[in-house]
A protein has these predicted regions:
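Charged helix-capping and loop-helix junction motifs
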Residues: 55, 185-190, 279-284
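A short acidic, often aromatic-flanked loop/helix-cap motif at beta-alpha or helix-coil junctions
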Residues: 46-49, 176-180, 272-275
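Accessory alpha-helical/coil subdomains and C-terminal extensions
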Residues: 4, 60, 71-73, 79-94, ...
């Protein structure tokens, strides 16, 4: 049979002369397959072209007679795996590569009706929180503004909002490639608040995908007063700011301007839904 070598710290280990590894046998795998998170410690490291020529640990592959590279992750992980396979082929050491599309964002190009690994579990756990928030809104007569992870896609926010019958869901895809502005987002939520009031309902909840932030122009970000730092891949580090608090503050300001007395509260659906125990769908996925 095959020997399975687990590599800690993601791609960092392949560009390190002394990678941290663990041999994974069947009894070990049987004890971790139904757990949340990752047994192998992860890393956000994405190698530059110069890293391949200067730091790539080809000896690790040849010494261990590695024939198959299995990667688990999103688009950055997949593209790097492809670069590694091509690099090794150029070095006369071709390998096979299998990529497991794992991301709660559900933003990889898979066959229709096939979500990414982990998405359904994150959606399920997010919906548990969102349902409780909606009950609180009805009980207290308040509004809640939720922000959900999703980087550049709105699938998670939409899935959670749809499951909980939220009166307003804001995702980047709904703007149909027109310019996304803070004013548009705020006005969508305000319109839902007004509509509910006309219906005799003084409470509600809106969920906004963090993906809308990626679509905001630099000018819009400056006008809003939002300050982002960026990771090594050039992505805004959205996890370092509370999107729910930002939007809630803007919505409260607009409500005050138009004379509507509505209390709203922010709720961030973030890292706490990433490493939840997988539901049955994901347990049978892979």
């Amino acid at each position: 049979g095959y020997r399975v070598i687990g590599l800690h710290e993601g791609y960092t280990g392949l560009f390190n002369p002394s990678p941290r590894t663990v041999d994974i046998d069947y009894p070990m795998a049987d004890g971790i397959f139904n757990q949340g998170g990752s047994f192998l410690q992860m890393s956000r490291f994405k190698p530059k072209d110069s890293d391949f020529e200067n730091n790539f640990n080809l000896k690790f592959f040849t010494d261990n007679n590695i024939k198959l590279l299995v990667t688990v992750g999103g688009d950055d992980t997949a593209s790097t795996a492809n670069r590694i396979a091509k690099f090794l082929e150029a070095k006369k050491y071709p390998i096979a590569n299998i990529h497991v599309p794992k991301t709660i964002d559900n933003d990889l190009p898979l066959p229709k009706g096939t979500p990414t690994f982990g998405y359904e579990s994150a959606k399920d756990k997010g919906a548990v929180i969102a349902r409780a928030v909606y009950v609180d809104a009805r009980t207290s007569g308040n509004w809640f503004v939720l922000a959900a992870m999703g980087r550049s896609a709105g699938h998670l926010a939409f899935g959670i909002g749809e499951a909980c019958h939220y009166p307003m869901i804001v995702i980047p895809e709904m703007f149909d490639k027109t310019e996304i502005t803070v004013e548009k987002i705020v006005n969508l939520v305000i319109s839902s608040i007004i509509k509910r009031k006309i219906m005799g309902m003084d409470y509600g909840a809106a969920v906004i995908s963090e993906g809308v932030f990626h679509a905001l122009s630099d000018e819009e970000i400056r006008k809003s007063g939002i300050h982002f730092t960026y990771d090594e891949h050039g992505h805004p580090e959205l996890g370092k700011v509370s999107k729910a608090h930002i939007f809630n503050e803007m919505i409260e300001k607009k409500l005050k301007e138009i004379g509507l007395k509505v209390k709203s509260r922010p709720v961030e659906l973030g890292y706490e839904i990433r490493c939840q125990t997988p539901i049955a769908y994901d347990l049978t996925y892979c």
